[in-house]
């Protein structure tokens, strides 16, 4: 395992090192009020970042499309096709966490720091070719959410970028045994990966329509924007399929008290439980993505629905009980009662139930589900 990427790829480790160093200098020069420090989290922060080999296919004059491993066959006999040697490149977003000082007003500070870091995000997204995101976090909120997988992964694997070191920034957050994560984290994983699957199902329909238009000649074959959009749509669908497979496996392990902080060990734990090997293949795809998905959408859909039943089967009475606190949280933040059938259940459980119905019925997420998920995610 490298500093940032999975496996041996020193050139990408250096790329991320250099980018973080330069971003650190840029952030320091901004002198952003109430900002305590910035770290790189996510896969590249804990040495689990993905690597893809990129071929740049040049179609016609001034038109380029990035592909994995194999060239794009062109249907235009007048087009030129030139390929460069494959080069390793980043395959995932760079997820930075900007930690505020203690005792600051939450919404105002998050908005101000987010706006101040926006030019840095935009500049480096363009330079690196992957999304460079800054999530602004308040210390007390991280402490409040310390039982969440996202927080636990962050405090276990990060790379210092600017300001105070992570050791100081995260000193108040307890490290939790992976096997003792609460069942609600399994529900949250199923909710989020289910939403990603719904987005992929919706996007896949758009891509199919676009390909049909290209075949019919409704869209000119010389329109590189249409081709590039198809490539991006497929990439989006493939990534969410993979995240779904990984998320379902992780949720199962959390619900059974078998979770582990290293993804390779989670794959081994699932293999010991007699899984079909799909999770292990998804791990390989995560580290070395290709243009072919780990499975098709229907397989991902069936896997999610099966996983939902496994996770729900392990729910405890406290997690699936109706309480005044749950009702109050929903009413205050959503300003509506919502479905009577699930009223006063934990908001994550309520949204998970809605996600399940949408996936079961192959329905696109409606405005109500989107709003619920955005508020309680």
What does each model-identified segment do?
Residues 119, 281-286:
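Extended charged low-complexity segments that act as oligomerization/scaffolding linkers
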Residues 102-111, 161-165:
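Short, polar/flexible loop-turn hinges at active-site or ligand-entry regions and domain interfaces
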Residues 271-283:
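Short, well-ordered alpha-helical segments
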Residues 7-15, 19, 114-215, 230-256, ...:
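Conserved NTP/Mg2+-binding pocket subregion across the NTase superfamily
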């Amino acid at each position: 395992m490298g500093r940032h990427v999975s496996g041996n790829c020193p050139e990408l480790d250096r790329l991320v090192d250099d980018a973080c160093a330069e971003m650190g200098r840029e952030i320091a020069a901004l002198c952003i009020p109430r900002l305590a420090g910035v770290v790189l989290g996510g896969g590249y922060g804990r040495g689990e970042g993905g690597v893809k080999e990129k071929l740049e296919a040049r179609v016609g004059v001034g038109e380029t499309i990035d592909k994995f491993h194999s060239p794009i066959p062109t249907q235009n006999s007048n087009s030129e096709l030139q390929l460069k040697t494959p080069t390793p490149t980043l395959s995932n977003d760079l997820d930075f966490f900007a930690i505020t000082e203690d005792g600051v007003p939450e919404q105002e500070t998050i908005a101000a720091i987010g706006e101040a870091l926006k030019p840095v995000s935009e500049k480096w997204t363009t330079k690196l070719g992957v999304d460079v995101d800054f999530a602004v976090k308040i210390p007390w909120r991280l402490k409040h959410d310390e039982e969440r997988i996202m927080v636990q992964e962050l405090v276990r694997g990060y790379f210092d970028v600017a300001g105070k070191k992570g050791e100081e920034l995260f000193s108040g957050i307890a490290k939790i045994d992976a096997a003792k994560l609460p069942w609600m984290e399994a529900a949250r994983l199923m909710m989020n990966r289910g939403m990603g699957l719904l987005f992929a199902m919706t996007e896949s329909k758009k891509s199919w329509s676009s390909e049909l238009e290209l075949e019919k000649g409704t869209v000119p074959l010389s329109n590189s924007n249409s081709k590039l959009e198809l490539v991006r749509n497929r990439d989006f669908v493939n990534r969410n399929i993979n995240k779904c497979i990984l998320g379902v496996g992780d949720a199962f392990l959390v619900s059974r008290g078998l979770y582990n902080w290293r993804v390779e060990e989670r794959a081994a734990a699932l293999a010991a439980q007699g899984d079909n090997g799909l999770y292990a293949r998804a791990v390989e795809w995560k580290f070395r993505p290709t243009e072919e998905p780990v499975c098709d959408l229907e397989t991902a859909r069936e896997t999610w629905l099966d996983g939902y039943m496994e996770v729900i089967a392990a729910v405890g009475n406290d997690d699936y009980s109706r309480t005044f606190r749950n009702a109050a949280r929903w009413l205050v933040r959503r300003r509506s009662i919502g479905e009577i059938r699930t009223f006063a259940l934990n908001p994550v459980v309520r949204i998970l139930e809605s996600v399940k119905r949408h996936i079961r019925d192959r329905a696109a997420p409606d405005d109500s589900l989107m709003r619920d998920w955005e508020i309680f995610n």
